[in-house]
């Protein structure tokens, strides 16, 4: 099997419908057959209430569907499919994406010319065609504090001052050239099978957010290269798969950052546990309050 594609969905039925339509068109072009020989597609639905699973079963019988009885999270959902995936390469794909023609072939061919690459990510585009800044540096505790309190926004990209505050989101790079990176956004990642066999699957202790950061960190620690290439493009309806749970998303993000710090940076500094966790959760509730004041989330 050449390629296994995995999509984890939760209440994104119409986005998922468009995602699978674009994916099938791309896979037919890639394989030269409507039978989709040598590729497989998994959809893991995390107990959606919008009939996402029923839509997949009815409209896309070529997909291997798993309909969970409860929301097991992004990492666990991907791992469910990874346990059955047999491809030499695995594509992790968000349901709020649409493949731009030629992207999958470009990503697959990339590994031929970059033998040390374990992961390659495409350029993500907004619906208006503009480029999303989708790559990040690995988070440090101090760097994330700068980000969460808004210092990165106080010093605009390209300015000669405040560069340290912009490092996490790589704001001084336009995402228009090919380069090695720390962590591309998990909306679309092409992964080599040998990497999965070596470092394992996603850490299910991360329910939603930071699981791919942890996974990329482990990959680079094991000596693999992670690449971004603008020669492959994917349309990304940014944030649509998580915007419905803004409060939960913020809390999960801060808990994920704490788990990442504890797992990779804490060492024997046990005395920092309470400080780090309390500080991050306090910042989370400050962000939630700010969103409510701006009317971006409800008070419920």
Give the label of every model feature segment.
Residues 1-37:
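N-proximal low-complexity "stem/linker" segments adjacent to membrane-targeting elements
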Residues 22, 42-53, 70:
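A conserved acidic beta->alpha catalytic loop
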Residues 67-85, 106:
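Glycine-rich, basic loop-to-helix element that forms the pyrophosphate-binding segment
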Residues 90:
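Short aromatic/hydrophobic "clamp" motif used to bind/position activated sugar donors
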Residues 98-134:
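Conserved donor NDP-sugar-binding/catalytic core segment of glycosyltransferases
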Residues 139-181:
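Short, flexible, basic/aromatic active-site loop/helix in glycosyltransferases
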Residues 173-233:
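A short, conserved alpha-helix in the catalytic core of glycosyltransferases
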Residues 217-297:
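Active-site-adjacent helix/loop segment of glycosyltransferases
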């Amino acid at each position: 099997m050449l390629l296994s594609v995995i999509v984890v969905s939760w209440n994104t039925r119409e986005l998922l419908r468009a995602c699978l339509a674009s994916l099938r068109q791309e896979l037919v072009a890639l394989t030269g057959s409507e039978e989709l020989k040598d590729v497989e597609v998994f959809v893991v639905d995390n107990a959606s209430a919008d009939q996402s699973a029923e839509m997949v079963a009815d409209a896309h019988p070529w997909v291997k569907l798993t309909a969970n009885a409860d929301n097991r999270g992004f990492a666990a959902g991907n791992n469910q499919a990874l346990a059955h995936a047999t491809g030499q390469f695995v594509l992790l794909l968000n349901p709020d994406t649409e493949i731009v023609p030629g992207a999958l072939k470009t990503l697959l061919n990339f590994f031929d010319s970059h033998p040390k690459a374990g992961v390659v990510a495409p350029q993500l585009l907004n619906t208006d065609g503009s480029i999303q800044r989708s790559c990040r540096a690995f988070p440090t505790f101090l760097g994330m504090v700068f980000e969460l309190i808004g210092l990165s926004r106080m010093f605009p990209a390209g300015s000669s001052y405040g560069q340290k505050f912009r490092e996490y989101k790589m704001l001084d790079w336009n995402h228009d050239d090919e380069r090695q990176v720390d962590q591309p956004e998990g909306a679309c990642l092409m992964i080599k099978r040998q990497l999965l066999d070596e470092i394992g699957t996603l850490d299910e202790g991360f329910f939603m957010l930071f699981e791919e950061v942890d996974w990329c960190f482990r990959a680079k620690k094991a000596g693999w290269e992670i690449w971004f290439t603008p020669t492959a493009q994917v349309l990304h309806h940014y944030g649509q798969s998580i915007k419905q749970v803004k409060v939960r998303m913020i809390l999960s993000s801060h808990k994920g950052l704490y788990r990442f710090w504890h797992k990779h940076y804490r060492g024997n500094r046990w005395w920092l546990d309470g400080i780090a966790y309390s500080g991050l959760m306090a910042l989370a509730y400050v962000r939630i309050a700010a969103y409510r004041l701006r009317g971006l989330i409800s008070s419920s």
